[in-house]
Amino acid sequence: MSSNIVLTVDVREGTGKGAARAARREDLVPGIVYGGKLDPVSVTLRGNEIRKALLGGHFLSNMIEIDHKGKRQTVIARDIQFHPVSDKAMHIDLYRVDEDTKINVNVAVNFTNEDACPALKRGGVLNIVRHDVELLCPAGSIPESVEADLTGLDIGDSLHISAIKLPKGVVPTITDRDFTVATLQGSRAVLTDAEEETDETPEEPEAIRQKGDEE
């Protein structure tokens, strides 16, 4: 997935908390660019550009172009720190990549075809174990989300990662087991109805036994 996010950066001369606070007073966000075969570089980014990019969603799973005096480089955001009160971006780590660089990213799981799920039709509940999954992806092919198809799943069934179709070249980072993404459970009402049906079934054999005793 290519990116349309472009962020302007400037090399940050000063380091330490004092320099970082001074940058934030100017609505600049301190950051670092690292990875590849180049040395890490301390930078500042425009606060308004960061806010706009964050509003667009999927900031941590998009390829980003950083522009320094007309020269561009492709990166991906690996971490972003926010102020605990104002929720403003405080620091960003940017990792240098190209189209084929393999990286670990958390990708959202979207559940589809709920209307074709017998468990939900019967009043069951979808218990989501993982709202997102960690995947190993080429930087140029990061999916925005993956789809988990609920078609045909009934109460008591589980949906595992092997049931989710992943794009070419994308694999789960957990490889030692077929981990669970969601389960289908009966609601309290469904379970109560089932228990009542179970309680009623012995009545007929009991009646037959009593009739035999009378004879």
From Swiss-Prot:
Record's GO cellular component terms: cytosolic large ribosomal subunit
InterPro entries: Rbsml_bL25/Gln-tRNA_synth_N, Ribosomal_bL25/Gln-tRNA_synth, Ribosomal_bL25_b-dom, Ribosomal_bL25_C, Ribosomal_bL25_long, Ribosomal_L25_dom, Ribosomal_uL5_bac-type
Protein name, UniProt field: Large ribosomal subunit protein bL25
Taxonomic placement: Bacteria, Pseudomonadati, Pseudomonadota, Alphaproteobacteria, Maricaulales
Biased composition (Basic and acidic residues): 206-215
Biased composition (Acidic residues): 193-205
Function as written in the Swiss-Prot or TrEMBL entry: This is one of the proteins that binds to the 5S RNA in the ribosome where it forms part of the central protuberance.
Organism this protein belongs to: Maricaulis maris (strain MCS10)
Complexes and interactors: Part of the 50S ribosomal subunit; part of the 5S rRNA/L5/L18/L25 subcomplex. Contacts the 5S rRNA. Binds to the 5S rRNA independently of L5 and L18.
